[in-house]
Amino acid sequence: MSIFSRPIGMALLLMLASSFNTVATEKKAVELLGSSVPVGSKLSYIATEGDIELPVTVINGAAVGPVLLLAAGTHGDEFPSMFALQQLAKEINPAELQGTVLIVHLANLDGFHGRMLALNPKDNKNLNREFPGSKSGTATERLAELLTREFISRADYFIDMHSGSANQKLLNHVYSPFVGNAKLDALTFEFAKASGMQHIIMYGDRPRDPANSISFPNTAMTRGKPGLTTEIGHLGWRDEASIDYALNVARNALYFLGMLPGKVMLNQQAVVYDEVSYVDAEFTGFFTPLVTTGDKVVKGQALGQVTDYFGNLVQTITSPVKGNVLMINETPPIKKGESPVAVGLVN
């Protein structure tokens, strides 16, 4: 039986956590990008380096404990977690906190104001594909380097909080990566379960080279730190239900790590997916979905149709596997090679 297919006992969990324990034995002020945050205090400010600006909150707890990094806005058009982290920053009392919480409220500020799907308008690059970045690179590469150097380096645990863009409808889910380090992979899976999210996707397709980590959370993983990606909310909405959901995920992380008093609300109906199958469009034109998120589909079932600019059917997209629909495009534009549907294979 795989370590990912059974619950881990508390004793083993504590052993796993202790094997990655980098917690300082003495509390000190947090010095971050020009600001000093004393023990038992918090500060929200615009951190700057050169032309890079990052809205951040540093909450330096009164007692020693882990460093939890939470980030939203890696893609500037994914809003619910931005609002959730604003609320979280306001509600945490540093006097009650064990450890330190680092919040990057909006990692891709230029993408946010440029109203772009995933990209940075300064160089048209996807921040979540440019890690660990380069200090002498393009705007996005320099941003990735700064996030790696100043934030990932300080963190013990990390959650990169996303949502579906304006074209995507999705089921809320969390990605639990694995990199071939048994203890790290098991601890990361426990961290994912502690999010309280129902849909947990195992994936190990990211590079394991820290010099070519590509994504924000994989940059943590390749440096020996659990790093999750959450997808909460969709279609570019900022609905209260998704904001509350993301806020509870962040709270669960704090409870799981013992940073705040509280009980982790596990999802008793959690579903673990061994992999996700993406289906590509073979033509450019209009996409019309025939299923929706949460639907159970069988191999060969029609998932959607592609028509040309004149309304002629050119492709029926079918499922290559049996599983659950996790994501589907809800807007018509489709280009050849794009994947408008994702189907999860259930463990």
Where are these predicted regions, by residue range?
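Bacterial N-terminal signal peptides
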Residues: 9-19
